[in-house]
């Protein structure tokens, strides 16, 4: 499998997850991803690290079984009411400084990183970036974010339990991609947002 990046010569690393629902309905996957995104309920990965699935859409809106595009975003959810350390005074931050911190909008989160993914409904395969713009997403973090998002209790009644497993070997990814008749996966990094495109050769 030939993997290339357009508009950028930056390093690209990818991994994959196998995502299976019951029954195995390709049409059901887009509904599942879209419903999960609308919940806007982040997943706590570890400590103050959280993640979500965002920007879900079809690659080809006119194709019934089109691959699904999206992003996995991770960020830090800081407790603004905890004690803060002042590097200058080498002591607890002053009340004035802590007040400024508490006034930060709750919808803004630091240390954001996002990683594009593409999901093939017919093979249940999600290929996603694990390295982008010098930031990394471990496959275990990705698995937890995707699993917990798609298995949110608010979705279980409609979609049932979703099985999300790691595909450890790159050759397995190549094999599954070949099942769809795709010989080239071209990952295109746009200026405004990420876009994963497929090129048939």
Each predicted region: which residue ranges?
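Terminal interaction module
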Residues: 1-91, 133-201
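Long, hydrophobic/aromatic-enriched structural stretches that serve as scaffold segments
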Residues: 68-134
